[in-house]
Regions:
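Short glycine-rich anion-binding loops that position phosphate/pyrophosphate groups of nucleotides
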Residues: 140-142
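Acidic, Mg2+-coordinating phosphoryl-transfer loop and its flanking beta/alpha structural elements
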Residues: 187-192, 197-198
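Acidic, divalent-metal-coordinating active-site segment for phosphoryl/phosphodiester hydrolysis
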Residues: 174-185
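Conserved N-terminal beta1-alpha1 strand-loop-helix module at the mouth
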Residues: 1-87, 92-99, 106-107, 112, ...
Length: 213
């Protein structure tokens, strides 16, 4: 089953609640929330307080993507704010700490995922795959929305699908054309920002991604 996760980085933050309700009504399966610290990536976005208010306006699962250094220091705060899913970057956390967080979060019923940047080889996450519920493959260099899809993500997705049975999510440059390619490669969760939030018809944009073949 293909799931569509509107990426709130591309939403209008002056009316975030209505933006969330709009994509929820249009058929979103979950919401992708990018958290950036200005260190791991150059941009700065939001913290646990904003996630808490997001939780108050939707029942959709919140996938909080921590693009931050030392994510283990902040995971508890984001869980307390109402996150349903937590994603950390393999480049930002040691394997031992990742395993510890995995055990903690799974006990709480929180889904735990790992993400890898375009330049990071798949071999980097192979030792920890059994500790995560999903993998997020970045198809742009993280930090800003509206970037173009990096085709090098496709063989990585295909190789990952051959060894991993959990959800494979893709984030970056997703539209109706790139959606076809990543789904064919083996991805089943697609995070899309600009394509959804800038569309004249939000529902049709989500449907085009979900039904891309």
């Amino acid at each position: 089953m293909i799931k569509v996760a509107p990426s709130l980085l591309s939403a209008d933050f002056s009316c975030l609640a209505s933006e969330i309700r709009k994509v929820q009504k249009a058929g979103a399966d979950l919401l992708h929330v990018d958290v950036m610290d200005g260190h791991f990536v150059p941009n700065i976005t939001i913290g646990p307080v904003v996630v808490k208010y997001m939780r108050g306006v939707t029942k959709l699962p919140l996938d909080v993507h921590l693009m931050i250094k030392n994510p283990e220091k902040y995971i508890d705060a984001f869980v307390a704010s109402g996150s349903d899913m937590i994603t950390v970057h393999i480049e930002a956390i040691a394997n031992a700490k990742l395993k510890t967080q995995s055990a903690k979060l799974r006990k709480k019923g929180i889904k735990f995922g790992v993400s890898l940047n375009p330049a990071t080889p798949l071999s980097k996450i192979k030792p920890i795959l059994k500790y995560v519920d999903f993998v997020l493959v970045m198809s742009v260099n993280p930090g800003f929305g509206g970037q173009s899809f990096i085709p090098g993500a496709l063989p990585k997705i295909k190789q990952l699908r051959a060894i991993f049975k959990g959800d494979i999510a893709v984030d970056g440059g997703i539209n109706d054309l790139t959606a076809k390619k990543v789904i064919k490669a083996g991805a089943n969760v697609l995070a899309a920002g600009s394509y959804i939030f800038k569309a004249k018809d939000t529902k049709k944009a989500i449907e085009r991604i979900r039904n891309a073949r």
